[in-house]
């Protein structure tokens, strides 16, 4: 399921990162790689703040939809 469907506080493992090559590379540089653990901190209007690799990252709804957990 896409990251946008995850509720706040849930911990999930990333199964796949989709999108164009440029988008995938951008997300990988932020730490969104297959097998990484991601926790949703908060979600407002589809935009999310997530915890990944001991960092908090804000991503928009379009980016979050490309991350499959």
Enumerate the language-model features and the residues they cover.
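Compact, glycine-rich, soluble single-domain proteins
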Residues: 1-69
């Amino acid at each position: 399921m896409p990251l946008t469907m995850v509720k706040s506080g849930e911990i999930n493992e990333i199964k796949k990162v989709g999108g164009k090559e440029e988008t995938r590379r951008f997300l990988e540089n932020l730490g969104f790689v297959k097998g990484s653990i991601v926790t949703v901190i908060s979600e407002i209007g589809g935009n999310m703040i997530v915890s990944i690799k001991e960092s908090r990252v804000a991503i928009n709804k379009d980016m979050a939809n490309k991350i499959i957990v």
